[in-house]
Amino acid sequence: MANNKSAKKRIQIAERNRLNNKSYKSTVRTLTKKTLENCEKYKKEPNEDNMNLVKTSLNKAFSLIDKAVKKNVLHKNNGANKKSKINKFVKTALNIK
């Protein structure tokens, strides 16, 4: 356990940051799942509304991943990998080459 005041503060800060990062990562996972679900919905029933759902959820997911990378919650390669996987799935769902 920490003995001095500054070490105790650092422990508190590390715990606070851990919880914030955990929340951020959870939100990234949730938006990724939502994007993939919307892609599946579009595959089953291709129409303009479902296309808009896919596009908006894709933009939100990419935006949040970029913000997580900027805040050092995710490593830049990890963020790029996540975006690549999502984009690959979306392109196959929308039949884009």
Curated annotation (Swiss-Prot):
This is Small ribosomal subunit protein bS20. Belongs to the bacterial ribosomal protein bS20 family. GO terms for cellular component: cytosol; small ribosomal subunit. Binds directly to 16S ribosomal RNA. One of its GO terms (biological process) is translation. SUPFAM superfamilies: Ribosomal protein S20. It comes from Prochlorococcus marinus (strain MIT 9215). The lineage of its organism: Bacteria, Bacillati, Cyanobacteriota, Cyanophyceae, Synechococcales. HAMAP family: Ribosomal_bS20. InterPro entries: Ribosomal_bS20, Ribosomal_bS20_sf. Gene3D superfamilies: Ribosomal protein S20. It holds the Pfam family Ribosomal_S20p. GO terms for molecular function: small ribosomal subunit rRNA binding; structural constituent of ribosome. Keywords: Ribonucleoprotein, Ribosomal protein, RNA-binding, rRNA-binding. Disulfide bonds: none annotated.
